[in-house]
């Protein structure tokens, strides 16, 4: 389904994977169930948020003809035949730039196992979305630590990584990520629309769109994360970084070809609602009046 000019595909952030998912089989089966359910509902992009204290998984030693390998093969075939896009989103408690060694090691372990799983289901490209996390009052130093830890991962894992912007001005804008991460280790930027309204890094929304897209490899459709504010003023300026339950406007693209993940509390219901109603929604007016 083509959702208007240059917006090809849409998905939503799924937060229903439990931190107590027991072992590789149940995790793989939950992924298969989710992508199959999304596909049936006309949603060709699946994004799964990895919860805090996620059960350690081990995909490095899956035996042939085991129930795990059968599910993994089913996911591989499904993704290949349907060209379904699969992403994992790691919130900021997975923190490669942390000053606490155990946090860094736990984060690297989760990233490595997800990368192995993605390799097994045939996903070799950008598919793991990271936030940098706390800046400790020193954004540059934190980004340098983050980049060092990225480069300590295996090449296959690094090729799947991307990084996204934050809403707090003390954290990481698209401007920060461009100079501090993309130019250093080449991770593409996943642009988050609502956080940019509160932490623009001196860029207009249009400028941030174009800069984020420019970080993606040629031939790959960038993935962005979109939500609208739960509170706006009379000029349409966002007053709260908390996302609204549904979208009231069409997702802007500025003529750029992108796929979009909706980050909204209503999840699947909100995504289906957008698919059903986007033609009747108003175009979004990007107001020049906004927050720094």
Label each residue range with its predicted role:
Residues 65-70, 143-147, 175-176, 203-210, ...:
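Charged helix-capping and loop-helix junction motifs
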Residues 68-188:
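Active-site acidic/histidine proton-transfer and metal-coordination neighborhood
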Residues 57-59, 97-99, 141, 173-175, ...:
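A short acidic (Asp/Glu
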Residues 6-10, 51-53, 91-95, 131-135, ...:
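Active-site beta-loop-alpha junctions enriched in small/polar residues
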Residues 25, 164-175, 197-207, 269:
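Active-site glycine- and acidic-residue-rich loops that bind
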Residues 187, 198-292:
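Histidine-acidic metal/acid-base catalytic patches
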Residues 1-12, 44-48, 86-90, 126-130, ...:
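Hydrophobic faces of well-ordered beta-strands that scaffold small-molecule active sites
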Residues 1-86:
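N-terminal pre-domain/capping segments
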């Amino acid at each position: 389904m083509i959702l208007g000019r240059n917006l090809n595909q849409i998905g939503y952030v799924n937060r229903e994977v439990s931190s107590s998912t027991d072992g590789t089989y149940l995790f793989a089966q939950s992924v298969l169930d989710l992508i199959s359910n999304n596909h049936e509902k006309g949603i060709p992009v699946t994004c799964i948020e990895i919860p805090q204290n996620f059960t350690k998984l081990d995909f490095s030693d899956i035996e042939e003809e085991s129930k795990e390998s059968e599910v993994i093969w089913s996911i591989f075939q499904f993704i290949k035949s349907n060209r379904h896009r699969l992403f994992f989103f790691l919130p900021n408690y997975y923190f490669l730039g942390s000053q606490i060694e155990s946090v860094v090691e736990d984060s690297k372990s989760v990233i490595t196992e997800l990368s192995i799983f993605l390799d097994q289901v045939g996903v070799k490209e950008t598919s793991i979305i990271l936030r940098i996390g706390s800046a400790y009052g020193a954004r540059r130093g934190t980004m340098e630590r983050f980049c060092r830890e990225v480069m300590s991962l295996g090449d296959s894992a690094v090729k799947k990584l991307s990084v996204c912007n934050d809403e707090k001005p003390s954290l990481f804008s698209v401007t920060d990520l461009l100079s501090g991460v993309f130019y250093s280790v080449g991770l593409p930027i996943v642009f988050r629309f609502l956080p940019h309204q509160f932490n623009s890094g001196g860029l207009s929304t249009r400028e941030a769109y174009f800069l984020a897209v420019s970080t993606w490899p040629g031939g790959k459709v960038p993935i962005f994360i979109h939500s609208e504010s739960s509170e706006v003023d009379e000029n349409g300026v966002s007053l709260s970084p908390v996302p609204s339950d549904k979208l009231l406007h069409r997702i802007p693209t500025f003529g750029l070809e992108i796929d979009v993940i909706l980050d909204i509390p209503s999840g699947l219901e909100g995504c289906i609602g957008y698919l059903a109603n986007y033609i009747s929604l108003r175009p979004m007016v990007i107001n020049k009046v906004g927050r720094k």
